[in-house]
Regions:
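ATP-dependent adenylation/nucleotidyltransferase module used to activate substrates
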Residues: 2-275, 280
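ATP/NTP-dependent adenylation/nucleotidyl-transfer catalytic domains that generate, transfer
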Residues: 2-14, 40, 222, 251, ...
Length: 357
């Protein structure tokens, strides 16, 4: 029988990751209790989203069961939040008898996007395109690299021709710094099909960047979390996106020590979508109206263009909160329109390729 390759994210996961939902949540409660006893000076980010709802219920049940000290809860308001989310945060605080402090960024979403640009497709793609716009490296270097017989020599030449542009060269040429092709990784432009050709034929007329997330969420979080020993978040593997490489210990992606000496705890990391649905049904958890009434499947910074469903989601929100939809279009509209152009371009290219056989 042929061996099946399993990544370390799979092979190094703890045994409870494969338990059924009831047993898994029981195991997680024990883990929560252990870490809260060891690190009682803990802070938890509560977003008002569905993962956060499962997490706060699990944390508070565990606290009551093991008589553990209170957790500091914070809600980071980016400045572009639905009323449904803000109302739900208040209702959740009342439900559990806890305080959920609202924290606002020093640089708001409007200021951040005006100064740095707006996201497009993904955080990785936004970072790559932002650097390309800043460095002004021509897209033609990708053709040079593709056509070069000695790709390592060509990569070296490009480094000398465009100093201090390492990441941009790798991004555009879909290679690494040694000149080895890396066409199938997330850190290159063609991780989004035909993107390099698209921006060549339809250059963006606006600034692209995902720094709004840094300024409106990450910086605010670092400011508030710095005095706590343990930071608790609702991150889950089933969400996808960027994840850290696991260490040798099998709980590396659930519980880690940061370079600052703090601990980062993700109690829901191995909770699947099915586990989450079971918990909601079994304990009768009510999500915010954004889910239960509007019909959204995810929430966050309203209308963030990194979501491929951003425009569709805004239309679900519009009947209930037209003003926040208008604000999202004013802030992210250029990115929405450019995404629509890219999607149309991609489909046309796929159709053309299929017709040619």
């Amino acid at each position: 029988m042929k061996d099946v390759y399993r990544s370390k994210v799979y092979t190094d996961r703890p045994p409870y990751a494969d338990y059924d939902a009831p047993a898994k949540f029981t195991a997680i409660q024990s883990i929560v209790a252990k870490h809260l006893k060891q690190h009682p000076n803990a802070i938890c980010s509560y977003s008002g989203g569905s993962d956060s709802d499962i997490m706060i219920d699990l944390l508070e049940k565990t606290r009551d069961l093991f008589r553990l000290p209170p957790i500091k809860y914070v809600f980071f308001n980016t400045g572009l939040e639905m009323r449904a989310t803000k109302d739900h945060v208040k209702a959740t605080a009342e439900k559990y008898g806890v305080e959920i402090e609202e924290v606002r960024p020093k640089v708001g979403i409007v200021q951040a996007t005006r100064k740095y640009g707006v996201p497009f497709v993904s955080k990785i793609m936004s970072a790559g395109l932002s650097e390309w716009q800043k460095k002004n490296v021509p897209l033609s270097i990708a053709d040079e690299y593709d056509n070069a017989e000695d790709k390592q020599a060509k990569r070296k030449e490009l480094r000398e021709r465009y100093p201090k542009c390492e990441s941009v060269i790798n991004f555009l040429c879909c290679c690494n710094s040694a000149g080895e092709p890396r066409p199938n990784i997330q850190l290159v432009i063609n991780s989004s099909k035909y993107m390099r050709d698209f921006i060549g034929e339809c250059p963006p007329d606006f600034q692209i960047s995902a720094k709004c997330c840094d300024y409106c969420k990450k910086h605010a979080a670092h400011r508030v979390q710095k005095d706590y020993d343990m930071i608790i978040t609702g991150e889950r593997r089933d969400e996808g996106g960027m994840r850290s490489v696991p260490r040798k210990d099998n709980t590396a992606l659930c519980f880690t020590e940061t370079s600052s000496g703090q601990f980062r705890f993700r109690p829901l990391y191995y909770v699947s979508d099915a586990d989450k649905a079971w918990y909601k049904d079994y304990y009768g958890i009510k999500y915010s109206d954004a889910y239960e009434v509007y019909g959204l499947t995810r929430t966050g910074c309203c209308g963030c263009p990194i979501s491929y469903k951003a425009i569709d989601d805004l239309e679900l929100i519009r009947p209930y909160e037209p003003n926040v939809v208008k604000a999202a279009w004013n802030i992210f509209g250029k990115s929405y329109e450019y995404r629509q152009k890219y999607n149309a371009y991609k489909e046309a290219r796929k159709k053309s390729a299929a017709e040619k056989g």
